[in-house]
Amino acid sequence: MGYHKKDCTPNRKKRYAQGDHEYGCYPDDHYDIHKEKKISRTVADFSYFNQAGSVVLTSTSTDPSVEEIIGLVKFKEVFNGDLISLGGSSTVTVGNISPKAITFRIHKVTTPQYNPLLSPTIYVHTVSVNANMTFSVPLEFVDVFIDDEAEVNYYYTVSIPTGVEATATVSSSTHTGNLYR
């Protein structure tokens, strides 16, 4: 009758330590199973800010592009492999002098900056518009992390292009975010 060697493969390395004897591994008494990353995804907490009221975009034919922040979703402690699902919608009312298009963006900020609009853009959605129209714009995006971050902020913005004389009002904006770990 022989002994069966216990499995010490890398995925079990934390739970078991290599023994000094020929029979394999023994349980590691200092290992906390509750700290082990779970395979199933769960929703984590997040902080949410939505711009109060409405945003009015107004430009002249000599102005550069006008971009305004309409929402912010913030997460603390994001880890490798985490999945973030962002969503939301905004109602847009275009004035009688309209831009040809309105662009919605999501900017991702992992380190605090003075101007979040200078951070990388991870989502762009452009909508063609006509004068005196009202419509709703849905926003959906999924982000997967490959590095750990102490904090990540997602800024939702809306803009009209350069060199256009236009007015538009963005209201009833709702933005949500779910982090799955």
Task: Give short role names for the model-derived ranges.
Residues 2-181:
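Extracellular jelly-roll beta-sandwich "head" domains, especially the C-terminal globular C1q domain
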